[in-house]
Each structure stands twice: as C-alpha cells, then as structure tokens.
C-alpha cells in the first residue's frame, strides 16, 4: 500500500526538512519537496506544504513559531500549474488550515489567496487539513474544508484518529471517520 506524507509542524520539531524528506518517499511528483501531486483511481491529489516562516525559510529543527505558516510563491506557481493540468476531480491535503472561521493562529497566512485559486477551479472538491487538534468542518464557496482531529492528544487508542475517504460515482464525498473523526456524506459542487 503506498503511503503519502503531509508534512506538519511536529515533523520538524527535532529534525530538518531535508532529513525528513530523505527518510520518506512519496509516490507521484514529489521532486524532493514536501509538496507534490499524485493520482489515485481517477482523482488528482495535491499535497501542499505551508511549513514556512515569515522570512521565507522552511521550518527546520524547531526553528519555527507554530502559529505562523505560509505557502511560498514558488509553491503557489506550482499549484496554479497543477490545478490547470488534467480533468480529474481534485482533493487537496495540507497540515495548517485554509478555513476562515477558526483561530488565526492555526491558519495559513495567505489562505485567502490559496482558497481563491481553488474557487476558480470547479474540479477542487475537498481540502483535508490537520493542525487544529479539535477538528473542524466548514464549507466555503462550495468547497469542503475538513480538519481531522489531532491524534497526539494522548497515548490511549481513542486518540488514534483517522478517516477513510471515498469520492463516489455520484460525486459525493464519503468520510468514514474513526474514533474522534465524525462520519460525513457531503455533496460536491459541479
């Protein structure tokens, strides 16, 4: 079973970005970066990396303030290209939030710019996020933003939160949540 990694701030607590990337492999177009794309069963998946400091440096060995995250210009240009290629439905994965109705400290600084790119492309159906340990759901202009609850809140099994997701043939998003992650059946925009 292939594994895909979405880099988060806790991944950079004690190791460098380069060390993390050298010990993992992501199928698809990783290009030695923590942002990349891949296609599974006719669905394009885009993984974004917002682990950047205000000065543009990447999070590295604890050199960051977890309340600041941004998607840099180079990655935005790559994202524009990815959004314009192909005709598959798109699912996006990112650690920090792109939502609007959550505390600013858990959001990407340039979230509105990223959301507007998604909103201009009807193929973007859902964004899966982390970082906000409580979890969250929000629909913004027809796109679903689902924040999976944190799985680092304790050592007991109920904290091992995850979800199995399916885009069905009718275009619905089926989220089969485990433990603290709620189940959802969501209609997608056309």
Describe the function of each predicted region.
Residues 124-130:
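Metal-dependent active-site segment of extracytoplasmic phospho-/sulfohydrolases and closely related
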Residues 106-114:
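Charged helix-capping and loop-helix junction motifs
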Residues 1-81, 85, 113-124, 137-176, ...:
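Extended active-site neighborhood of metal-dependent phosphoesterases/phosphodiesterases
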Residues 83-102:
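Short acidic, glycine-rich surface-loop motifs adjacent to enzyme active sites
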Residues 177-183:
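Secondary-structure transition/turn motif
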Residues 11, 98, 134:
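Short active-site segment of divalent metal-dependent hydrolases/proteases
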Residues 8-9, 95, 130-131:
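Active-site glycine-centered loops adjacent to acidic/histidine catalytic or metal-binding residues
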């Amino acid at each position: 079973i292939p594994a895909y990694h979405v880099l988060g701030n806790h991944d950079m607590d004690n190791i460098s970005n380069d060390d993390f990337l050298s010990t993992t492999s992501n199928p698809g177009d990783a290009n030695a970066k923590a942002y990349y794309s891949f296609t599974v069963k006719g669905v394009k998946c885009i993984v974004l990396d917002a682990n950047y400091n205000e000065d543009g440096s990447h999070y590295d060995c604890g050199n960051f303030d977890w309340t600041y995250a941004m998607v840099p210009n180079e990655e935005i240009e790559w994202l524009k290209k990815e959004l314009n290629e192909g005709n598959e439905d798109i699912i996006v994965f990112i650690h920090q939030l792109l939502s609007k109705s959550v505390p600013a400290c858990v959001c990407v600084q340039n979230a509105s710019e990223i959301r507007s790119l998604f909103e201009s492309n009807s193929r973007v159906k859902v964004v899966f996020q982390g970082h906000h340990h409580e979890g969250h759901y929000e629909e913004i202009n027809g796109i679903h933003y689902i924040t999976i609850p944190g799985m680092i809140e304790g050592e007991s099994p109920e904290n091992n939160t995850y979800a199995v997701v399916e885009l069905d043939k009718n275009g619905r998003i089926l989220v089969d949540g485990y433990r603290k992650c709620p189940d959802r059946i969501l209609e997608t925009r056309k």
